[in-house]
Amino acid sequence: VTDLRIVKTRTNIKNSLIDLLAEKNVSKITVTELAEKAMINRKTFYRHYHTVQDVVDDINYDIVNDVISHAKKSDRDGNNLVNQLNFIGLSIVENKEQINKILKNSPEVFGSGRSVELLKRFIEVSIRPVLNFKNETKLKYLVEFVVSGFISVYVRWFNEGCAESSEKLADAVNEFVLGALSEYVRPKS
C-alpha cells in the first residue's frame, strides 16, 4: 500500500516538471528550479528522485504504462494487433496535452529509457504469437523497427500541431505496421 502523501508529492513534482518542459529544455532545468516550482524543498525532492532525468523517466514510464494498459484492455486474447495499436494511439491522444508540453522543448526525452523498453517488450509479446519465424535476433530488430517507427510518427504528428485527425493517423500507423509485418504473419488455420 502506497502512502497517499508520497503519491501526491511525486505527482506534484512530475506535473511541475511538465510545466517547466513547456518553457525550456530538460537539460536547462535544475533540481532547485523544479523543487521551487513544486513548492517543496530540495531535501523532499531527493527523497523521491535523484535527478531531473529520473522524473522525466518516471513521466515517460507512466505514459507508456497507460498506453499498455489501454492496449491490454482492447484485446483480452492478446492476438489482435490492430486493436492494440488503435488503443495505443488512443492513449497517446488522451495524454496529448502532457506529451505536447514535453515535446515542445525536449523531444529527445521520448524514444529512450525504460519506458520505451517496456513498450518494446509489450509489442514483442503482442506480435510473437502471430509471427511465422522463431529467429530471436530478427524478432528483436523487427520490434525495434515497429516501436521506433511508431514513436517517430507520433512525435512528428505532435510537432506538426496534430494537423491530421487521430483516427487518420491511427489508420496510417496500422497500415505501416501491418505492412512491415505482413511477410512474417502466420496464416490463419
Question: Which stretches of residues belong to each language-model region?
Answer:
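Amphipathic alpha-helical packing segments from all-alpha helical-bundle domains
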Residues: 107-132, 137-152, 182
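N-terminal intrinsically disordered/low-complexity leader segments
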Residues: 1-7, 185-189
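Short glycine/proline-centered loop/turn elements that form peptide/ligand docking sites
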Residues: 25-32, 39, 52, 131-138, ...
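Amphipathic alpha-helical segments that line or abut small-molecule/effector binding pockets
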Residues: 78-97, 144, 148, 152, ...
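Basic/polar phosphate-binding segments, predominantly the helix-turn-helix DNA-binding elements
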Residues: 2-6, 12, 34-56, 91-94, ...
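Short, hydrophobic secondary-structure boundary micro-motifs
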Residues: 29-30, 100-102, 111, 166
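Hydrophobic alpha-helical segments that form the core
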Residues: 137-159, 164-180
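An amphipathic alpha-helix adjacent to DNA-recognition modules
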Residues: 10-18, 22, 27-28, 36-39, ...
